[in-house]
Amino acid sequence: MIALTLAALALSASPQAAQDRAAPSQSAGSAAPAAETGATQAARQWLALVDAGNWQESWAATAQSFRSMNTVQAWQSASESARVPLGRMLSRIGRGEESIPAPPHGYQLVRFRTDFANRAGASETLSLAREGGSWRVTGYFIE
């Protein structure tokens, strides 16, 4: 299966990442269950912007490392090429979160199984880093 890579993966986070590990969570639709970590909740909130086709706001909500490597126009073009053909998001189930110990402090990977109108069972993976006290997306991948 060909991966639709929408952004480069930046490797920056804080030691907080290790504290926010969680067992895989499951959720129908896009509602976040109470047991989800801050990183998973931030990923869902960011994906809601992407689901709505709000490219400017979703770009602005990413980490500085993402924004420095991607212009709004490049993000919009890549998103429209990869996401729009999938159609409306129908359901998104959390498949887990993983701390990756990479320099300087690691990052969190959050995975979802997502059904879109034109493609069931897609795998979405987001990398997130702590920035300014919040989790911010540094990379987004669809397979």
Locate predicted features:
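Exposed beta-sheet edge and beta->alpha loop/turn motif
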Residues: 96-143
